[in-house]
Regions:
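"A position-specific structural signal for the A-helix of alpha-solenoid helical repeats
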Residues: 5, 22-25, 39-42, 73, ...
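Alpha-solenoid helical-repeat scaffolds
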Residues: 363-555, 559-566
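Long, intrinsically disordered low-complexity tandem-repeat segments
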Residues: 609-668
Length: 825
């Protein structure tokens, strides 16, 4: 038996009897501590009393309340069982249990020790100078040893009650204890509540967040209660105060803003590997090349200037400096946007013995930390440690790494470098006092320290990792905490809108889907746009259309209108799409994308219904909406089935997805068929040529024109345009597929085969890059499509066009074999 065999009956069906039977079997099978057995006996006796009362025919008006209270007691006992399972399974919890036995973790006992430490430190000012330093170091070392034991004790502490939670909250908010101690204990409770969802520990963190006036303590408590929220809301719902607390906190706009900032920063942390790769590949080589220092076996020395360099090329130094400044600015811009630019470098510096202790990963940086004793001696007379503590731009974890590393190489440094350690220039751009007090900066710094722990701690798999975007294994969490059902409420909808925009910009479609599922019942028109992305990604255009249509007419936003127009185009309701684009153009008469989309819709109107599958040319029926951009008209995927519309979505219902599958406005117009006079189509044609005249170098317009040429049977003209498109650096894989169709339809089969092979190669390259990016972010990626599958899928989507111009199903099958060079019959 296990924790989950007790837990599931409770949260799924509130079945106390089944949970107690499972717990009885667990006690019989495993040697559990006496306090768990005692708790089980108490709950069992309470439940038997209820049963006995019912057997005697007694009626209790509060029977439901009593049953719920017993349910909560069983839940608490099940959490204690979970702690014991972790102690047996994971070394970190086993060590914590051993260490905890030496420490009394009752709030009153803890308060006595922490307040005594503050008083003793104050009394050090009256000690003689010749003994003060030694006594302070001993006092600090003893206190650190106590805090280490207390941290471990809290990690494996049994489930609290409301009284203990309130006492600890009062203690951590008390001005009579050291702030660093309060910060460390907040982290200890957070780590405990993350791995064993004790609602009372969670409530203590929330209470500290609400009442704290110290910004650093407040933000650490924010991170604590957010990360210890469970993804499954059923457990916490047994405790009404959890929902009440969440509702009260979310009523505060400042809290909402801080949560949104925290969510975005967590996603930046998850992208640390990709950011590090960008820095190592495109920035660091330039910075290293232009440095005048080199490492030798004797230490760091300055390189001699090359006297021939200025003679051969007198402008080299200036160019090198400009290039170095440009790369450096790029790195600083990445940092300002939220990127964790220091992770790559400092991740190699977490092997010091300092990081063997669990609590040190969460310790605020303090130059007086006992583990920095050797560093203080080697840096005696230097202000380096104080500068690092006050102005260093790194998170606390990296500050410790930096201090320990500098101390190791201090003896091998040139004198001028040692002198530089006394200045702020050592750290590059320092952090101003105002920035250090900014809640967003405080939160970012703490999250970066946490990210390093969950990525680099030697026993990291002992703990749930909140920086994972997919639940890949049992000990992984979900970094997208704003998709938790416990937080889904009207107050959070504006945050959800802002976050979805952030995710969309980064093409994080899986995360948008998670948000959409969480807020599927919302009627917020700005949020509906993102909710519709889920069915749009699956090609469920009617479902997406219904979502947009559910928005009252007078509440439509520009974004929801764009999404609705896109659905209309995909559903071939071109008349309705025309009306919506005219409405959008009334808002923005000069909008290029709206004009281009209107032109395609006009050319695809009902007046050309005789064309068969008339111009689904903007049919993004395969749209995965992955890069839906409110203002984009990315016709890069114009054409062919290729239009998997990775470039279109709810907001960019654009001509970008003009595809072959959708034979377009004149799809039935073969080489010898003349278009019938039609004012609507004529308007579309004029508008298209107008856009081409005004934007002669716009690839999107050229793609639409090329597509129209092919649809009308003017294959030579289409080939000419596609040839020019393919010669441009911004050519996309879809251009090759469309060009292949044009050559195939003109019976230049050899060239078509070559282009189709190039198309397959590019698609495989794009899939490999997407898979690598997903791997770095810890996310799952879609299965790779085989060439056979891809071509069959494309040809099937584009069957109407190919059939109209005489390419039969048999020819399509043979073409697939030719492209694949299949010879095994």
């Amino acid at each position: 038996m296990s924790f989950y065999e007790i837990y599931i009956p409770l949260i799924a069906k509130h079945n106390v009897g089944k949970a107690l039977r499972a717990m009885k079997e667990t006690i019989a099978e495993d040697k559990l501590p006496g306090y768990i057995v005692a708790r089980y006996e108490d709950v069992k006796n309470d439940y038997r009393l209820m049963q006995d009362a019912m057997m005697r025919g007694l009626r209790d008006d509060k029977i439901d309340e009593v049953y719920d209270d017993i349910t909560r007691k069983v839940y608490g006992a099940s959490l204690d069982v979970l702690i014991e399972e972790k102690v047996k399974k994971y070394s970190s919890f086993a060590y914590a249990r051993t260490s905890a036995q030496q420490t009394e973790a009752h709030p009153d006992a803890v308060r006595t020790v922490l307040e005594a430490y503050v008083q003793d430190m104050a009394m050090m000012a009256f000690e003689p100078e010749n003994t003060r330093k030694a006594k302070m170091e001993k006092l600090t070392a003893d206190h650190h040893a106590y805090m280490k034991q207390l941290f471990n004790a809290l990690l494996v502490a049994p489930m609290w009650n409301d009284r203990r939670a309130a006492d600890f909250a009062d203690l951590l908010l008390s001005p009579t204890i050291d702030r660093d101690d309060a910060l460390l204990l907040v982290s200890a409770v957070m780590l405990a509540a993350m791995n064993v969802n004790d609602p009372y520990k969670w409530d203590m963190l929330a209470e500290v967040y609400v009442r704290a006036t110290d910004k650093v303590l407040k933000m650490r408590a924010l991170v604590g209660w957010v990360l210890s929220l469970p993804y499954d809301p059923r457990g916490p719902r047994l405790f009404p105060f959890v929902q009440e607390r969440i509702k009260a906190m979310l009523a505060d706009k400042t809290t909402l803003k801080q949560m949104l900032d925290m969510q975005m920063q967590m996603l930046f942390c998850c992208n640390a590997d990709a950011d590090n790769e960008e820095i190592q590949r495109n920035i660091m080589p330039t910075l290293i090349k232009n440095t005048n220092l080199q490492m030798t076996r004797l230490g760091i020395v300055e390189k001699e200037d090359d006297p021939m360099k200025d003679i051969m090329d007198p402008n080299t130094a200036e160019r090198d400096m400009e290039e170095m400044e440009r790369k450096y600015r790029k790195m600083m811009d990445m940092q300002k946007q939220g990127s964790d630019i220091y992770f790559g470098g400092f991740s190699k510096m977490k092997t010091f013995p300092f990081f063997y202790d669990l609590c040190n990963w969460f310790a605020p940086f303090n130059a007086a930390h006992p583990a920095l004793g050797a560093a203080r001696e080697r840096l005696a007379g230097s202000t380096f440690l104080n500068n690092l503590m006050e102005n260093g731009p790194f998170c606390d974890s990296d500050k410790y790494s930096f201090a320990l590393a500098i101390a190791q190489i201090m003896d091998r440094m040139p004198d001028n470098i040692k002198e530089m350690l006394n200045s702020d220039a050592t750290f590059g751009p320092t952090v101003s006092k105002d920035d250090q007090e900014d809640p967003a900066y405080i939160c970012r710094s703490y999250l970066q320290s946490l990210y390093r722990f969950f990525r680099l701690y030697r026993s990291k798999r002992d703990f749930l990792n909140p920086f994972i975007l997919d639940e890949l294994e049992d000990n992984d969490g979900n970094a997208l905490f704003m998709s938790y059902k416990l937080l889904a409420c009207p107050e959070m909808e504006e945050n959800a809108v802002a976050l979805c925009g952030f995710l969309l910009k980064r093409k994080m479609m899986r995360e948008i889907m998670s948000m959409a599922i969480c807020y599927k019942s919302s009627q917020n028109p700005r949020l509906v746009r993102f909710l519709a992305l889920v069915p749009m990604t699956d090609g469920k255009w009617q479902e997406a259309y219904d979502l947009f249509a559910s928005v009252p007419e007078d509440q439509h936003t520009e974004e929801s209108l764009r999404g609705m127009a896109h659905c209309c185009m995909s559903l071939k309701r071109f008349g309705e799409a025309v009306a919506i684009y005219r409405r959008l153009l009334a808002m923005h008469p000069d909008s290029f994308s709206y004009q281009l989309n209107l032109a395609v819709c006009l050319m695809s109107s009902d007046a050309f219904s005789s064309c068969g599958d008339a111009a689904s040319s903007c049919d993004a029926s395969s749209c995965d909406a992955s890069s839906c951009d409110a203002s984009s008209c990315d016709a890069s995927s114009c054409g062919a089935s290729s239009c998997d519309a990775s470039s279109c979505g709810a907001s960019s219902c654009d001509a970008s997805s003009c595809g072959a599958s959708s034979c377009g406005a004149a799809s039935s117009l073969g080489g010898k068929v003349e278009a019938r006079p039609n004012k609507v189509v004529e308007e579309g044609t004029k508008l298209l040529y107008k856009l081409d005249y005004e934007h002669p170098n716009n690839a999107n317009v050229r793609r639409v024109l090329a597509w129209c040429m092919m649809l009308q049977g003017h294959f030579d003209k289409a080939i000419d345009i596609y040839t020019r498109l393919l010669s441009q650096p911004d050519a996309v894989s879809a251009d090759r597929l469309n060009a292949a169709y044009a050559h195939w339809l003109s019976r230049d089969v050899a060239r078509a085969v070559a282009l189709l092979r190039e198309y397959c190669n590019l698609c495989e390259q794009e899939e490999a890059e997407a898979k690598e990016a997903a791997k770095k972010q810890g996310r799952r990626c879609e299965p790779t499509k085989s060439r056979n599958y891809r071509l069959v899928e494309d040809f099937t989507k584009d069957a109407d066009l190919l059939s109209k111009y005489g390419i039969s199903l048999t020819e399509r099958k043979i073409m697939v074999d030719i492209v694949l060079n299949e010879e095994e019959f």
